[in-house]
Amino acid sequence: MTNRMELSGTIAKPPIRSKSPGGIEHCRFWLEHRSTVIEADLPRQVYCRMPVVVSGLRSQAITQNLVQGSNIKVSGFVAYQTGRNGVGKLVLHADNITQI
């Protein structure tokens, strides 16, 4: 099975940094993506907003320059996460972030 995603866009809200009770660093933010793709030989406008999380020892190093409005390319894996309110969503767990 393959679970790999790459998405570019703009950081829509200021990143939130936190530490879990186990001492693991996390950085969370929303990535807003807009593009045009060809589907069925026709151009289609694409828009999505996806939550991104970066965890672990590298999180501080790869997120230290991120601010709201930064244009970035993110790669990682996607996982389903259920919030405290019971609503589920897909989250991109990033292992690489590049400023563009």
Curated annotation (Swiss-Prot):
UniProt-recorded name of the protein: Replication restart protein PriB
Purpose: Involved in the restart of stalled replication forks, which reloads the replicative helicase on sites other than the origin of replication; the PriA-PriB pathway is the major replication restart pathway. During primosome assembly it facilitates complex formation between PriA and DnaT on DNA; stabilizes PriA on DNA. Stimulates the DNA unwinding activity of PriA helicase.
Species: Vibrio parahaemolyticus serotype O3:K6 (strain RIMD 2210633)
Span of domain SSB: 1-100
Pfam families (alphabetical): SSB_1
Transmembrane segments: none
GO CC terms of this entry: primosome complex
HAMAP family the UniProt entry points to: PriB
Self-association state and partner proteins as the record states: Homodimer. Interacts with PriA and DnaT. Component of the replication restart primosome. Primosome assembly occurs via a 'hand-off' mechanism. PriA binds to replication forks, subsequently PriB then DnaT bind; DnaT then displaces ssDNA to generate the helicase loading substrate.
